[in-house]
């Protein structure tokens, strides 16, 4: 009834989408729709809950980031309605590389963290670092867990190889489990982590609210215990078990 009063022009067929108004041009409407798509993909999906807040801090405000991300998708001709989660991660990291190349190591690791919180990916993402330097230590960790059951309650009937298949252990250069504001402060100070952080993802004990895997910061066997090959790094910054359940279900 008020369409004429407000100068609203809309499609004549359902769902009667607004094309423009007295205050918003057609171009403005299209721009807002593209921003809405980015918000749906990267915020409302709750699949990027650690990467997005840190990347967003590099922009004046959230709208500025989603607006620029929408332009990036449009200019590159990327698909918005793709079912592949890895595709969305890859595009977001490409966008981050363009906007803030100095933070890429952290952004990549936050993407890996977000991905493994959601699923025990059988195919390792292309943006994840090579885990071969820690192979022996990871194997040794699961062998010790089979004996002592320190981090995985409820897995008593499974042996080491089964534990390794059913869960995931990732070694990060950054303490990705920390709050976004802590990581943002580290970035702003130009701080480089001196130690690695090993995080265990437990998919049988998920957070009831978010459906994310339960996580624990764990201690990997030392080089002497695991007998790694020359040049392998160790994880020295072990902390107590934590049960973070950040993010939300698909």
At which residue positions do the language-model features occur?
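A structural motif corresponding to the C-terminal lobe/cap of the Radical SAM core domain
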Residues: 1-65
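Radical SAM enzyme core and accessory elements
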Residues: 37-250
